[in-house]
């Protein structure tokens, strides 16, 4: 008997761009072919994110009226066809505090906050941070140069149609740029008065 996360036994058929939940089933995707390239194991969280399927060339849309955290078939009345639909993944973010020292150049927030695991948590390490941007008081911010404390840095979804950021429960960022110590050498003082 062959058991697989997606297909138990595959003879003379094609399996491509397909997924199974490796959190729920830890075996192979295709029972009689453990290295089959068409059946990829994804975590439960990855299976609830539409980008997983879109990146595999699925015709899928994010639809807030869908309550399923896995893709469902839905009629698209605008385009008169069936499509895959999935609820947008709700995410909370944690930016937290970052400290650096003035170096004469702009310190980019995308360099300081560059790890999706730290920002969205271990279960959402697959989120592409290039689809998000930073804002302060509703204005886009890419970085800061001068020594100062910069508070209330928020993460904003810029182009990820398969995720939404929660309105509450997020931890905004704070960037502290410390002054650089000044080193002075080879100075001669004239006209000294004591």
Q: What kind of region is each of these model predictions?
A:
Residues 75-81, 86-194:
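Solvent-exposed beta-strand/loop surfaces, strongest in extracytoplasmic domains of secreted
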């Amino acid at each position: 008997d062959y058991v697989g996360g997606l297909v138990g036994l595959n003879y003379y058929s094609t399996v491509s761009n397909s997924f199974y939940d490796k959190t729920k089933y830890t075996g192979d995707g295709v029972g009689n072919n453990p290295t089959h390239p068409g059946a990829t194991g994804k975590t439960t969280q990855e299976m609830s994110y539409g980008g997983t399927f879109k990146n595999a060339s699925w015709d899928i849309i994010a639809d807030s009226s869908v309550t399923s955290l896995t893709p469902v078939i839905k009629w698209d009345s605008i385009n008169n066809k069936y499509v895959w639909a999935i609820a947008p993944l709700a995410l909370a973010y944690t930016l937290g505090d970052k400290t650096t020292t003035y170096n004469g150049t702009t310190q980019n927030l995308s360099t300081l906050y560059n790890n999706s695991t730290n920002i969205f948590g271990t279960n959402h390490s697959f989120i592409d941070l290039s689809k998000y941007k930073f804002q302060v008081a509703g204005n886009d911010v890419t970085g800061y140069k001068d020594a100062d404390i910069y508070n209330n840095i928020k993460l904003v979804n810029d182009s990820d149609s398969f995720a939404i950021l929660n309105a509450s429960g997020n931890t905004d960022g704070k960037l502290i740029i410390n002054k650089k110590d000044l080193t002075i050498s080879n100075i001669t003082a004239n006209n000294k008065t004591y």
